[in-house]
Amino acid sequence: MPTVEKSVSLKSYNTFAVDVSAQYFAEVCTPEDIRSVLADPRYGQLPRFVLGGGSNTLFTKDFEGIMLHMNGGTIEVTDENDRFYFVKVSAGIVWDDFVRHAIESGWYGIENLAAIPGTVGGAAVQNIGAYGVEVAEHIVEVECFDPDRRAMRVLSAEDLSLIHI
């Protein structure tokens, strides 16, 4: 199980550098990390907040609960054909690092989304976009952890309803 810290300052975890604290804080990378933290009776029933890069989060007060900070992970090609690469990317990967990796690997299509702050998980949730490109155009499905069922769940791009208004 990842280490769970108590009374952690969130100042370095948000781009506004707001100095508030989380009652409990854990760095997580995998679904197993999340599952193990939430399976612990000390943390499983607490309010929870999943934090990525902190670039679209404005804290206004201390968080009373367990803060799960998505951090790191893997980038893996799961399939490919004549036109596409199918890539599984962990939510905690820094978005710009993934874009750079994609360009260096010859996986084109998301290069217009370079230099957008945050993580891959946040990119999918927010449908980041720039210069006529939206990340939704490149998502087939998202695998996510359902904390209530404590199980993985796969959502199709249609299930996500990723649109910009």
Indicate residue ranges for each PLM-predicted region.
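Anion-binding (especially nucleotide phosphate/pyrophosphate-binding) glycine-rich loop
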Residues: 2-138, 142, 146-148
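A short, charged helix-loop
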Residues: 154-161
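Conserved small/polar residues in nucleotide/adenosyl-binding loops
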Residues: 163-165
